[in-house]
Curated annotation (Swiss-Prot):
Residue pairs linked by disulfide bridges in the UniProt entry: C14-C20
Signal peptide: none
Lineage per the UniProt record: Eukaryota, Metazoa, Chordata, Craniata, Vertebrata
Major location (coarse): secreted
Protein name in the entry: Brevinin-1SPd
Family: Belongs to the frog skin active peptide (FSAP) family. Brevinin subfamily.
InterPro entries registered for this protein in UniProt: Antimicrobial_frog_1
Function: Antimicrobial peptide with activity against Gram-negative and Gram-positive bacteria (MIC=13 uM against E.coli, MIC=3 uM against S.aureus) and fungi (MIC=3 uM against C.albicans). Shows hemolytic activity on human erythrocytes (HC(50)=8 uM).
One GO term describing the cellular component: extracellular region
One annotated GO biological process: defense response to bacterium
Length: 20
């Protein structure tokens, strides 16, 4: 369950900061 949340958080951060 945690890996899914971490993945979603990373995706959001990536989209906001444009740093992937």
């Amino acid at each position: 369950f945690f890996p899914i949340i971490a993945g979603m958080a990373a995706k959001v951060i990536c989209a906001i900061t444009k740093k992937c």
